[in-house]
Amino acid sequence: MAKKTDTRIVINMACTDCGERNYTTEKNKRNDPRRIELNKYCPRCREAKVHRETK
C-alpha cells in the first residue's frame, strides 16, 4: 500500500484583482516550491482572472 507523506498540502487560490478566495486545491511541495498562479474563473469579477496561491 502507498504511504501517506507530507508532500501534498492544501492551499487556497485568491483572485489577484478582487482578492476573493474562490478555489481550494492541493499541491506537491517538492514539484512546486514557489507559489502557483492559475487562470481561473472569478464569480465576483465575472471573468477569468489570474488566481494566486495564498498562505
UniProtKB/Swiss-Prot annotation:
GO MF entry, a single one: structural constituent of ribosome
The keyword DNA-binding appears for this protein: no
GO biological process assignments: translation
Record keywords, A-Z: Ribonucleoprotein, Ribosomal protein
Gene3D superfamilies linked to this entry: Ribosomal protein L33 (2.20.28.120)
PROSITE patterns: RIBOSOMAL_L33
Pfam family, one: Ribosomal_L33
KW Nucleus (keyword) present: no
GO cellular component, one term: cytoplasm
InterPro entries in UniProt: Ribosomal_bL33, Ribosomal_bL33_CS, Ribosomal_bL33_sf, Ribosomal_zn-bd
Family classification: Belongs to the bacterial ribosomal protein bL33 family.
Protein name: Large ribosomal subunit protein bL33
Organism per entry: Dehalococcoides mccartyi (strain ATCC BAA-2266 / KCTC 15142 / 195) (Dehalococcoides ethenogenes (strain 195))
UniProt lineage: Bacteria, Bacillati, Chloroflexota, Dehalococcoidia, Dehalococcoidales
Gene behind this protein: rpmG
